[in-house]
């Protein structure tokens, strides 16, 4: 994996690995509702570049901002933090 400096890092779960050298990562964050003050889960999906097709569906991964690699890919895979359990 590449060295990444001064880039925003996200940790999320791989929800799709069907594309070649590309994974879809769902990142969950918590926001406070501006009227009710309740913490709300907000999730967003990002496409990330996985050069060696290392990440599999269900893995927990860290991705980092990068220059645009395609129309939708603007992140690269930094590391696979936790592999998914095979059932």
UniProtKB/Swiss-Prot annotation:
Transmembrane segments: none annotated. Keywords: Ribonucleoprotein, Ribosomal protein, RNA-binding, rRNA-binding. SUPFAM superfamilies: Nucleic acid-binding proteins. Coiled coil: none annotated. NCBIfam families: PRK05610.1, uS17_bact. The keyword Ribosomal protein applies. One of the primary rRNA binding proteins, it binds specifically to the 5'-end of 16S ribosomal RNA. This is Small ribosomal subunit protein uS17. Gene3D superfamilies: Nucleic acid-binding proteins. PANTHER family: 40S RIBOSOMAL PROTEIN S11 FAMILY MEMBER, SMALL RIBOSOMAL SUBUNIT PROTEIN US17M. Belongs to the universal ribosomal protein uS17 family. Part of the 30S ribosomal subunit. One of its GO terms (biological process) is translation. GO terms for molecular function: rRNA binding; structural constituent of ribosome. GO terms for cellular component: cytosolic small ribosomal subunit. The gene is rpsQ. HAMAP family: Ribosomal_uS17_B.
């Amino acid at each position: 994996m590449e060295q990444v400096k001064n880039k925003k890092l996200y940790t999320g779960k791989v929800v799709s690995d069907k594309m070649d050298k590309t994974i879809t990562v769902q990142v969950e964050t918590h926001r406070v509702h501006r009227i009710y003050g309740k913490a709300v889960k907000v999730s967003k999906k990002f496409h990330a570049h996985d050069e060696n097709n290392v990440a599999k569906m269900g893995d927990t991964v860290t991705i980092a901002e990068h220059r645009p690699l395609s129309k939708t890919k603007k992140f690269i895979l930094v590391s696979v933090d936790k592999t998914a359990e095979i059932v």
